[in-house]
């Protein structure tokens, strides 16, 4: 009979601790990720995009979308995630034949903003997308977009806003010869003028990949 109060006391003490632990779990949001490139005449090959050092976004060759408002690119649906904080990316510009990388720091209050945006643009009617863009000029950006899926063709109900813009990527080491074939395809199509070093490699018989 004497054990009853003790057990009750333990329960009362542990319950707030358990509730506190649950409340500390980060809120997750259901959104997709879109990767834009370009702009036109500045095609890129995005080698990797890593969010919060934990999950990767597929990318590859991209020619358009960087200079649109909002930017546009291929979309990857990755499932619910916490509000992103940092995006690392590395990409190659076929026109400059340079490699760039960048670590985009997203706004510290993004989680608070997402809570509001998901209330204003609920998932029942909207699909949310984190948009990241990497240009052939070595620039990077990030936007957020909510696309109304129940508004037919009326795009006036969509929402989009820049998160980070006009960020300069750092030129890093890399072998442009790895992209000889893809760069050559852009030259043949007239997408870009022949890069000087690409012409030299071609004359030296370095066909590359």
How would you name each of these model-derived features?
Residues 1-10:
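Bacterial N-terminal signal peptides that target proteins for export
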Residues 18-21:
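C-terminal motif of bacterial Sec signal peptides marking the signal peptidase cleavage site
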Residues 23-25:
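Bacterial signal peptide processing site
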Residues 47-95:
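Tryptophan-paired
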Residues 98-105:
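Edge beta-strands of extracellular beta-sandwich domains
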Residues 114-189, 194, 208:
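Compositionally biased low-complexity segments at domain edges in trafficked proteins
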Residues 203-206:
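Preference for solvent-exposed, low-hydrophobicity sequence contexts
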